[in-house]
Amino acid sequence: MKLPIYLDYAATCPVDERVVKKMMEFLSIDGNFGNPASRSHKFGWQAEEAVDVARNHIADLIGADSREIVFTSGATEADNLALKGVMRFYQTKGKHLITCKTEHKAILDTCRQLEREGFEVTYLDPKSDGLIDLEELKSVIRDDTVLVSIMHANNEIGVVQDIAKIGEICRERKVLFHTDATQSVGKLPINLSELKVDLLSMSSHKLYGPKGIGALYVCRKPRVRLEAIIHGGGHERGMRSGTLPVHQIVGMGEAYRIAKEEMATEMPRLTALRDRLYNGLKDIEETYVNGSMEQRLGNNLNISFNYVEGESLMMALRDIAVSSGSACTSASLEPSYVLRALGLNDELAHSSIRFTVGRYTTEEEIDYSIGLVKSAVKKLRDLSPLWDMFKEGIDLNSIEWTHH
């Protein structure tokens, strides 16, 4: 077993060796290095064919048509293109957008930008289990609502929203529906030929592909229109200009092909590892799982260890790579906005750790991690006067703390 143990697969994944091998064929003079937009010679044709094959692999995984896949630099750009592209294109129809407070920053910050441009955004509060209230969603849709954007699976707590029902509601009310499926693609079955989803964002590096490449699914029937946010040679049917990075696209395609092949066996294995971890940690006193355990990604466990500071716990767990909050915001010491939105107090939100298992995680690593977490939590609580007071039965909420 190699230390440190990587349990932060929701932040990124190593690139699968099979993907690396495939990508290497599209880089050097000995390989297929052409520009897919070069229509006048073999180098361009071969590159274009490789892009087509990859586009088909990606479409196959999510039950889409390959013509509905638009390559971007990642899921963040796909989210930006979906929200800004749609809201700007349809602004004569209306200027109202609905999302949820627990969305990824790529959605929330884009919404803030749209608000600065004069659009109006409604932010739904999730229930305490992380799921949105579908009746509340119905009640906030207005005549001038253009788009609803609700993520499929949450990056911090792994909670899975019912995108089939949300899609039905949106289609019935003639509102477009975008979902950020960065965390769920390749882990949950997604069939866009059946789901009423108009736009879907995805990433490559959360599925053992390279970083720097992602895609936006844009539905053709009924046709969704959007305004480009990057202009230039009119690539990707005018929706996203820029020379296609063939090696990255091929890498993403191969990663998605492998995921489709292995999903049926890999997901039960990951769920078993996650449950093994949970069963090893749940007996620690004052630990709480954040988010629904039923509607959840099989590889995600987000736990708060009361009376332990999350940052100190992460430092004490030097041999395990985990995170508190999402990688995109873990640089700040603010408690997770996702957990605060679920109604957790600052203390519990601050004491949360996200464990996410993946393709290279073993049972041995899980068992080692359980032992490490148990001893670290015990050690930190032994140092904590708050833990002593709690054990003495003092209600910490009733104490008036004063500044001296």
From Swiss-Prot:
UniProt key word ATP-binding: no
Keyword Transferase (UniProt):
yes
Annotated residues that bind pyridoxal 5'-phosphate are located at A75, T76, N155, Q183, S203, S204, H205, T243
Q: Which PROSITE patterns match?
A: AA_TRANSFER_CLASS_5
Task: Point out residues bearing the modification N6-(pyridoxal phosphate)lysine.
Answer: K206
Query: Chief subcellular site?
Result: cytoplasm
For [2Fe-2S] cluster, which residues are the binding ones?
C328
What does the UniProt keyword field contain?
A: 2Fe-2S, Cytoplasm, Iron, Iron-sulfur, Metal-binding, Pyridoxal phosphate, Transferase
Kindly provide the name given to this protein in its UniProt entry. Cysteine desulfurase IscS
Q: Which organism is it from?
A: Histophilus somni (strain 2336) (Haemophilus somnus)
